[in-house]
UniProtKB/Swiss-Prot annotation:
Protein role: Can catalyze the hydrolysis of ATP in the presence of single-stranded DNA, the ATP-dependent uptake of single-stranded DNA by duplex DNA, and the ATP-dependent hybridization of homologous single-stranded DNAs. It interacts with LexA causing its activation and leading to its autocatalytic cleavage.
SUPFAM superfamilies: P-loop containing nucleoside triphosphate hydrolases, RecA protein, C-terminal domain
Family annotation (NCBIfam families): tigrfam_recA
InterPro entries from the UniProt entry: AAA+_ATPase, DNA_recomb/repair_RecA, DNA_recomb/repair_RecA_CS, P-loop_NTPase, RecA-like_C, RecA-like_N, RecA_ATP-bd, RecA_C_sf
Annotated S-S bridges: none
Gene3D superfamilies: P-loop containing nucleotide triphosphate hydrolases
An example molecular function term from Gene Ontology annotations: damaged DNA binding
Residues that hold ATP according to the record: 66-73
Keywords in alphabetical order: ATP-binding, Cytoplasm, DNA damage, DNA recombination, DNA repair, DNA-binding, Nucleotide-binding, SOS response
Protein name: Protein RecA
Family recorded in the similarity comment: Belongs to the RecA family.
Cell compartment(s), UniProt: Cytoplasm
Domain of life: Bacteria
Length: 350
């Protein structure tokens, strides 16, 4: 077929597709500049920098996993609070039946406006999530956790019954349905997941996440959260030092790390993160135990500097803005990549 005939045939095919499926069903990527990805701040400037965009991407699936008490739910609740501050509507699907409203309120969550569901089964949880996504009204949905999404057949069965692959098939089916709807509605979906160990692994890490391989494929961002140190004030334990590895990122360069402090009862220390990242970026000067910013002494020792920034929110906001500008953090048009998995998911993946 000659070049001109091929173009005519393609134009006719595109016209038929648009007539049948609507305008924009098929388009050339170069025809129109895509808008930058919208984001929901994570609550930690170090994590925002590691994510490359300044937060969690809108319209995508995010998986947060790690050992028990590592800070997974805390990170998710900070995202909830930030989405609400921007005027967004958020749902929290509490499959573990373990949400602490008082702790969530301490982190800045508007618990009165938060939609909460405590489903009876995995099918019910994912069906509720799907209906909320398709309403187009939600900005963020958190599911805590994948391990607690127990299939109905397992709940109704006997204790010793075998249910191989049931949960993996449930997750695979749900994610196939929801991924496109998430992108259309610009709803971010955060799955909190637990770690398990494979038996008989001789080489490599024996750790794996629950729920099969589908979530690994469909997630645009995967975060590995670990507690690395206990923070003390004298002999009192006041918090944890947490490290987050971005093990997968389809919207910015992956494999970056972030460290931040989680204070007991208060959540992620925003001011501590500003000090740490400010020192790394060269905006905050550390001389001995003293921290200074543009000639202003923030305090002697990190705790005093943290308190100074807490008492001076305008200065903290200015420092945050300068850090993000200097590090070039923010959504860009050409960082977005394909949304679908690079390889198909087969029966052997369950």
């Amino acid at each position: 077929m000659a070049g001109g005939d091929r173009e005519k045939a393609l134009d006719a095919a595109l016209a038929n597709i648009e007539k049948q499926f609507g305008k924009g069903s098929v388009m050339r990527l170069g025809d129109e500049v895509r808008a930058p990805l919208e984001i929901i701040p994570s609550g930690s400037i170090a994590l925002d920098v590691a994510l490359g965009l300044g937060g969690f991407p809108r319209g995508r699936v995010v998986e947060i996993y790690g050992p028990e008490s590592s800070g997974k739910t805390t990170v998710a609740l900070h995202a909830v609070a930030n989405a609400q501050r921007a005027g967004g509507i958020v749902a929290f699907i509490d499959a573990e039946h373990a949400l602490d409203p008082d702790y969530a309120k301490n982190l800045g969550v508007d618990t009165d406006a938060l939609l909460v569901s405590q489903p009876d089964s995995g099918e019910q949880a994912l069906e509720i999530a799907d209906m909320l996504i398709r309403s187009g009204a939600l900005d963020l949905i958190v599911i805590d956790s994948v391990a607690a999404l127990v299939p109905r057949a397992e709940i109704e069965g006997e204790m010793g019954d075998s249910h191989v692959g049931l949960q993996a098939r449930l997750m695979s089916q749900a994610l196939r349905k929801m991924t496109g709807a998430l992108n259309n509605s610009k709803t971010t979906m955060i799955f909190i997941n637990q770690l398990r160990e494979k038996i008989g692994v001789m080489f490599g890490s024996p750790e794996t996440t629950t729920g099969g391989k589908a979530l690994k494929f469909y997630a645009s961002v995967r975060l590995d959260v670990r507690r690395i140190e206990t923070l003390k004030d004298g002999t009192d334990m006041v918090g944890n030092r947490t490290r987050v590895k971005v093990v997968k990122n389809k919207v910015a360069p992956p494999f970056k790390q972030a460290e931040f402090d989680i204070m007991y009862g208060k959540g992620i220390s925003r001011e501590g993160g500003l000090i740490d990242v400010g020192v790394e970026a060269g905006l905050v000067r550390k001389a001995g135990a003293w921290y200074t910013y543009e000639g202003d002494q923030l305090g002697q020792g990190k705790e005093n500097a943290r308190a100074f920034l807490r008492d001076n929110p305008d200065l903290a906001n200015e420092l945050e803005k300068k850090i993000l500008e200097k590090l070039g953090v923010g959504p860009t048009v050409d960082q977005d990549v394909a949304e679908l998995p690079a390889e198909p998911i087969g029966v052997g993946d369950f």
